[in-house]
Amino acid sequence: MSSTQDYIGEEAATRVKILSEALPYIQHFAGRTVVVKYGGAAMKDSNLKDKVIRDIVFMASVGIRPVVVHGGGPEINTWLDKVGIEPQFKDGLRVTDAATMDIVEMVLVGRVNKELVNLINQAGGKAVGLCGKDGQLMTARTMTNKDVGFVGEVSSVDARVVETLVKSGYIPVISSVAADEFGQAHNINADTCAGELAAALGAEKLILLTDTRGILRDYKDPSTLIHKLDIQQARELIGSGIVAGGMIPKVTCCVRSLAQGVRAAHILDGRLPHALLLEVFTDLGIGSMIVASGYDL
């Protein structure tokens, strides 16, 4: 019996210690906006999904203002298969004709978005689902010189609807679909949407959940994770080829958001349980943080 009591006491003491260490971060970030791009394995694994949702609700509960931007590639492929459309990609981009765009919008806006809203609400948060069309939050333009159909870039952002929601205590959950000036829906990369929205909101942080540890000096060796770097160092890593392949657009997205006023951008492994809390509320974090000059935390 005594050993059980000792165990319970030790566990409780550990929890108190963790909360105590997190307190300075909670105090510093209270009232500030954090944009989280949610995707990858953390979206497919139900156990990881539960932990991400709980992390987001925890952040809101301690006064941080989380905004969630999501994609949903695997579920799009599932539904394309159901209707007999074979997914096609070109240079890493989903070829999106009119029929595919209908499925993309149905899945991202009607299914994935509402599932995330429901999960956040069930966990004790207050979520509201949006896409780029709502309140003209984002206006798209067709990618030039790519020949991939209705795949877009962010032309402009009007973040007032999101600002209204976060100031009222809601957690906006935004799918990466937006219309162009003629009303045509476009599929936009969720990282890009998150970065541009973070800039428009003047966010404290942009966090990209990915399927890699972060920025590695040697992509084959997780122990070479770079925990903190500035904009110039990030650009140099791209120029030297250390940042390569699919990591280039993610780092570029982070750098662009920082150049527009976001204070810090993080790339972290969403496959790690409670990755968000570990990154935001611990000294070292678990991913890579790119910062604007003069950033202390």
Curated annotation (Swiss-Prot):
**Pathway(s) served:** Amino-acid biosynthesis; L-arginine biosynthesis; N(2)-acetyl-L-ornithine from L-glutamate: step 2/4
- One cellular component (GO) term of this entry: cytoplasm
InterPro entries linked to this entry: AceGlu_kinase-like_sf, AcgluKinase_fam, ArgB, Asp/Glu/Uridylate_kinase, Glu/AcGlu_kinase, NAGK-C
Summarize where substrate binds, as residue positions: G72, G73, R94, N187
Reactions performed catalytically: N-acetyl-L-glutamate + ATP = N-acetyl-L-glutamyl 5-phosphate + ADP
**Main enzyme class:** transferase
**In this chain's numbering, which residues are marked as the site (Transition state stabilizer)?**
K37, K250
Major location (coarse): cytoplasm
For this entry, the protein name equals Acetylglutamate kinase
What Enzyme Commission number(s) appear in the record?
2.7.2.8
State the Gene Ontology terms under molecular function.
Answer: acetylglutamate kinase activity; ATP binding
